[in-house]
Curated annotation (Swiss-Prot):
Residue positions of the active site: E110 (nucleophile), E114 (proton donor)
Disulfide partners: C232-C240, C277-C290
Keyword entries, A-Z: Apoplast, Cell wall, Cell wall biogenesis/degradation, Disulfide bond, Glycoprotein, Glycosidase, Hydrolase, Secreted, Signal, Transferase
Family: Belongs to the glycosyl hydrolase 16 family. XTH group 1 subfamily.
Residue ranges of domain GH16 in the record: 31-224
Glycosylation sites: N118
Name by which UniProt lists this protein: Probable xyloglucan endotransglucosylase/hydrolase protein 6
GO cellular component entries: apoplast
Domain of life: Eukaryota
Reaction equations catalysed: breaks a beta-(1->4) bond in the backbone of a xyloglucan and transfers the xyloglucanyl segment on to O-4 of the non-reducing terminal glucose residue of an acceptor, which can be a xyloglucan or an oligosaccharide of xyloglucan
EC number, UniProt record: 2.4.1.207
Binding site for xyloglucan: E114, Q127, T128, N129, D137, R138, E139, D203, W204, G208, R282
Residues of the signal peptide: 1-30
Protein species of origin: Arabidopsis thaliana
Length: 292
């Protein structure tokens, strides 16, 4: 016979209250994020301008400084996304970044989108990189198949126990699988914050540093809106990272589905311009994750 809730079952009462509070806590972490509630200026607050009552922002880069913002909390697994409209026209030498970072110095975990500025008429490149336990050097570059300065596009990082996927709109441009069983580093234990920055990097960003920033075109602007964070906030429920009921840990998200796999192959065949796995000048022997 099923138990009926009543004060005569104190253990059940405690469990019900705990479960309710936990679900409320997780629900809050999954609501649409806003800049005012969920983010703060990381540097040069004067160059971060709020719009639409904090639902959208503008980052500014000029000769004096760039700027950046960070989430107020850190998360352990989940999905983060933003809609971004990049710098139009001549943006050579600039980098607009959207990334997650554990902020743990030499052992940091980090998942990077870096949008590399261009000379007018050239395609915009996006570089992704993955740091696990302090080790990076996993760069891949893709030329975007549209002009990302004309309108907002959604950029997403999915981070689960099984894999990390970078999406441009609904198109996966990179997948990094968890191969810890083969002694390949994978970020599993360090919570990460969500960050974005706009800065000058003309020593490497555009054509390896050949194209320098043209300050006569400054100030440069990047725009953000529709912030979305669905993850396990830290501090938070201790069971959250391993909870199989979190949707990003569900069976449907343990690998790319058939449609995503086709789109991923299309990107790699038609738009990938650099892959560290095939760069024999840097890695005469491919890194272990490239052979897994």
């Amino acid at each position: 016979m099923a138990k009926i809730y009543s004060p005569s079952f104190p253990g059940t009462l405690c469990l019900c209250i705990f479960t309710l509070l936990t679900l409320m806590f997780i629900r809050v972490s999954a609501r649409p994020a806003t800049f005012v509630e969920d983010f703060k200026a990381a540097w040069s607050e004067s160059h971060i301008r709020q719009m639409e009552d904090g639902k959208a922002i503008q980052l500014v880069l000029d000769q004096s400084t760039g700027c950046g913002f960070a989430s107020k909390r850190k998360y352990l697994f989940g999905r983060v996304s933003m809609k971004i409209k990049l710098i139009p026209g001549d943006s050579a030498g600039t980098v607009t970044a959207f990334y997650m970072n554990s902020d743990t110095a030499t052992v940091r975990d980090e998942l990077d989108f870096e949008f590399l500025g261009n000379r007018s008429g050239q395609p915009y490149s996006v570089q992704t990189n993955i740091f696990a336990h302090g080790k990076g050097d996993r760069e891949q570059r893709v030329n975007l198949w549209f002009d990302p300065s004309m309108d907002y596009h959604t950029y997403t990082i999915l981070w689960s126990h099984k894999h990390i996927v970078f999406y441009v709109d609904d198109v996966p441009i990179r997948e990094y699988k968890n191969n810890e069983a083969k002694n390949i580093a994978y970020p599993t234990s360090q919570p990460m914050g969500v960050y974005s920055t706009l800065w000058e990097a003309d020593d490497w960003a555009t054509r390896g540093g050949l194209e320098k920033i043209d300050w006569s075109k400054a100030p440069f602007y990047a725009y953000y809106k529709d912030f979305d964070i669905e993850g396990c906030p830290v501090p938070g429920p201790t069971f959250c990272p391993s909870n199989p009921h979190n949707w990003w840990e569900g069976y449907a998200y343990q690998s790319l589905n058939a449609v995503e796999a086709r789109r991923y192959r299309w990107v790699r065949v038609n738009h990938m311009v650099y892959d560290y796995c095939t760069d024999r000048s840097r890695f005469p022997v491919p890194p272990p994750e490239c052979r897994a």
